[in-house]
């Protein structure tokens, strides 16, 4: 939508540069492990996919970027993750974790409010490759933004930074 000019800005996860797109803001957006408070791994500073494999998992479907990142890392390690739930709906996997069904994955921005409330624990996944994704605010290269849109971009830059 940004490249075609139908949108002034785009907010997306990215793993590569895009032609004709300027990045107004970028921050790392690693895949995080989601755990219920009180889980045996919840007090760790980080977890590995091998540790996560010991528990029931809710994972996104194979066609998603997050799942592809997980599958690449698992392939390198010869690790097989068996999901008991496959869903691309954040609310579904968060409920699964909160109700003690097991562990899942998400970006920090998707669960920031739940972590702040203490409703869920999010930890970095320390396996190499799980941090190779950015959250970007994108604009069309060479396009001047209207004042109101630029003000919104500035607000995003202020509000987006998180813990990771």
Can you say where each PLM-predicted feature lies in the sequence?
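A late-sequence structural motif
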Residues: 121-164
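Residues embedded in well-ordered beta-strands
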Residues: 32-34, 40, 56, 103, ...
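Secondary-structure junction motif
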Residues: 13, 56-77, 145-154, 160-164
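Short beta-strand->loop
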Residues: 22-32, 85, 108-111, 117-131
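Short beta-strand-to-loop elements that line the ligand-binding cleft
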Residues: 13-14, 60, 80-89
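Short beta-strand-centered segments that line the small-molecule binding cleft or hinge
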Residues: 1-35, 98-101, 121-123
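Short secondary-structure boundary segments
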Residues: 14-16, 37, 107-110, 135
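Short beta-strand and adjacent tight-turn residues that come in two discontinuous sequence segments
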Residues: 7-13, 88, 105-107, 111
């Amino acid at each position: 939508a940004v490249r075609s000019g139908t949108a002034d800005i785009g907010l997306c996860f990215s793993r590569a540069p895009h032609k004709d797109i300027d990045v107004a803001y970028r921050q790392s957006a690693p895949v995080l492990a989601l755990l219920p408070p009180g889980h045996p791994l919840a007090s760790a500073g980080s977890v590995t996919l091998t540790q996560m494999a010991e528990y029931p998992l809710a994972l996104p479907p194979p066609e998603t970027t997050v799942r592809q990142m997980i599958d690449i890392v698992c392939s390198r390690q010869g690790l097989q993750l068996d999901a008991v739930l496959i869903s691309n709906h954040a609310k579904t996997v968060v409920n699964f974790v909160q109700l003690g069904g097991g562990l899942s994955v998400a970006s920090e921005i998707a669960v920031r409010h739940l972590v702040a409330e203490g409703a869920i624990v999010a930890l970095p996944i320390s396996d190499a490759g799980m941090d190779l994704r950015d959250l970007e605010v994108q604009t069309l290269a060479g396009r001047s933004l209207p004042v109101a849109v630029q003000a919104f971009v500035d607000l995003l830059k202020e509000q987006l930074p998180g813990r990771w």
